[in-house]
Amino acid sequence: MARPDYYGNPAGLTDEAGVVRAIYDAFARRDLEGALGYVSPDCELDLAGTARLAGRSGPYQGHDGLRDYFRDVERVWEELLLHTEDIRVIPGSVIVIGHITGRRQGLVVSRSSVWTWRVKDGRATSVKVADLGDLAQT
């Protein structure tokens, strides 16, 4: 059964989900410039999985941090795809439930994930990803 358009965003009152969707779409195209337009210049990007693989110890900071993240993805992953399965909006925040699939050094990776975004004035101000472990196989 398909969910109604307003699912997780009652009455479609907020556009935060659109901002986050645009960032995911830009990432899928590896369109850094497209993503930058939706990210605050002082954003904090706590994307620990890729950061750890790239040898970083803290979050990516600001637009330069987003540039570093895109470079790190290209450097440490042969392939990395983000899959959004459900998006929930609470004014000011967007919760994305989904998973990642990737390939690194010939190994296939599938992990359940939850991304918590903060959005203000039409731009993402932060994101934190929670790695929920190996994706259950059905």
Residue spans for each PLM region:
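C-terminal and inter-domain tail/linker signature
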Residues: 1-138
